Amino acid sequence: MTELRQRVVREDAPPEDKESESEAKLDGETASDSESRAETAPLPTSVDDTPEVLNRALSNLSSRWKNWWVRGILTLAMIAFFFIIIYLGPMVLMMIVMCVQIKCFHEIITIGYNVYHSYDLPWFRTLSWYFLLCVNYFFYGETVTDYFFTLVQREEPLRILSKYHRFISFALYLTGFCMFVLSLVKKHYRLQFYMFGWTHVTLLIVVTQSHLVIHNLFEGMIWFIVPISCVICNDIMAYMFGFFFGRTPLIKLSPKKTWEGFIGGFFATVVFGLLLSYVMSGYRCFVCPVEYNNDTNSFTVDCEPSDLFRLQEYNIPGVIQSAIGWKTVRMYPFQIHSIALSTFASLIGPFGGFFASGFKRAFKIKDFANTIPGHGGIMDRFDCQYLMATFVNVYIASFIRGPNPSKLIQQFLTLRPDQQLHIFNTLKSHLTDKGILTSALEDE
């Protein structure tokens, strides 16, 4: 009887009410049915894509030990590849970061597309990739202008693009925004806005933080290599400690994570960070920022190392002196900063992985993709790296970076002659009042 009354009420409703009710029903179905449809959608699931050679060699092992060896062998292969791209230099590293960014974006967007593909959303994938292009143009254009100012000012096309960079970026984004509005379909309004938000959050997580990775790299390769290596070390050591000694679950989002692995990974990462920092601080190619040399028409990483990368003597606290018998220790100041980096990599960095685990559980998938056997997708390997990159960038800006004289000089040389003369007279007057200029002339 209740159903009959509801049908009568619906039939007696005015046309406008019926239309709004049907819209609400469609929207409600979109919101409520998304989870149920996601269960049947062809999501990227984890499959056994282990190379046939490894499958044969490890066929007699249990699944636990087979996974151990597969992960171990491919981890060593990835580390070897990491060494190769480091050897090739910062510009190749920048290209690799961009490729990783594109692949991570593809993996996340593909999950959304596979979940909602049955709705046949117009222009979803096209607009997602278009917005990726727009955001990359904005961020990398800013980076090139900031770090390679001399090169940009020398080339006429680059100078024009640099001058109007933000306007061009805004125009590109506005075009995509208008395309999205024009693609709206009445029965999919709510879901289309869901996916619009999905794309923009993905851009925020992937592209913005990839941009920060590039910034860290240009400050000196050591600011790129040490943080990434600390995250890799923590991932490996936490897995090893958890594999052999793990008994106590750490977090429900990742049932395989244990307190033993978490704590063991922390101490191992701090020691590793100190040792790696000591080795790298002695090489100019690692500690010098990437700069464009106008004379040689090339990018260089040669400079006079700052105090951060010069050995200094530190007094050891009395309590520790009695234990080890040393009163002082010689180390690089950067090693002290490496403790902060390795601590973040091992204590806070894993929460990037936990966040990714929650995301995957929400969509009932094991991995983002099957790109790397035993490891999942590229995003599965970089979920902690992006959080680490943001921390390093903030750390450099807050505690390390100061005014850059070379950048100031480059900007000074682009001014008009009258502006240069005004700055010269102001600076001369300031130095004379301070007694610096007079003292310098007397010394000569």
Curated annotation (Swiss-Prot):
The modification Phosphothreonine is found at residues 30, 50. It catalyses: a 1,2-diacyl-sn-glycero-3-phosphate + CTP + H(+) = a CDP-1,2-diacyl-sn-glycerol + diphosphate; 1-octadecanoyl-2-(5Z,8Z,11Z,14Z-eicosatetraenoyl)-sn-glycero-3-phosphate + CTP + H(+) = 1-octadecanoyl-2-(5Z,8Z,11Z,14Z-eicosatetraenoyl)-sn-glycero-3-cytidine-5'-diphosphate + diphosphate; 1-octadecanoyl-2-(9Z,12Z-octadecadienoyl)-sn-glycero-3-phosphate + CTP + H(+) = 1-octadecanoyl-2-(9Z,12Z-octadecadienoyl)-sn-glycero-3-cytidine-5'-diphosphate + diphosphate; 1-hexadecanoyl-2-(5Z,8Z,11Z,14Z-eicosatetraenoyl)-sn-glycero-3-phosphate + CTP + H(+) = 1-hexadecanoyl-2-(5Z,8Z,11Z,14Z-eicosatetraenoyl)-sn-glycero-3-cytidine-5'-diphosphate + diphosphate. Pathway: Phospholipid metabolism; CDP-diacylglycerol biosynthesis; CDP-diacylglycerol from sn-glycerol 3-phosphate: step 3/3. Its EC number is 2.7.7.41. It holds the Pfam family CTP_transf_1. Ubiquitous. Expressed in the ganglion cell layer and inner nuclear layer of the retina. It is found in: Endoplasmic reticulum membrane. It comes from the Eukaryota. It is a multi-pass membrane protein. Its main location: endoplasmic reticulum. GO terms for molecular function: phosphatidate cytidylyltransferase activity. The chain crosses the membrane at residues 78-98, 129-149, 165-185, 212-232, 261-281, 339-359. One of its GO terms (cellular component) is endoplasmic reticulum. Residues 1-38 have a biased composition (Basic and acidic residues). Catalyzes the conversion of phosphatidic acid (PA) to CDP-diacylglycerol (CDP-DAG), an essential intermediate in the synthesis of phosphatidylglycerol, cardiolipin and phosphatidylinositol. Exhibits specificity for the nature of the acyl chains at the sn-1 and sn-2 positions in the substrate, PA and the preferred acyl chain composition is 1-stearoyl-2-arachidonoyl-sn-phosphatidic acid. Plays an important role in regulating the growth and maturation of lipid droplets which are storage organelles at the center of lipid and energy homeostasis. Homodimer. PANTHER family: PHOSPHATIDATE CYTIDYLYLTRANSFERASE, PHOSPHATIDATE CYTIDYLYLTRANSFERASE 2. This is Phosphatidate cytidylyltransferase 2. It comes from Mus musculus. The lineage of its organism: Eukaryota, Metazoa, Chordata, Craniata, Vertebrata.
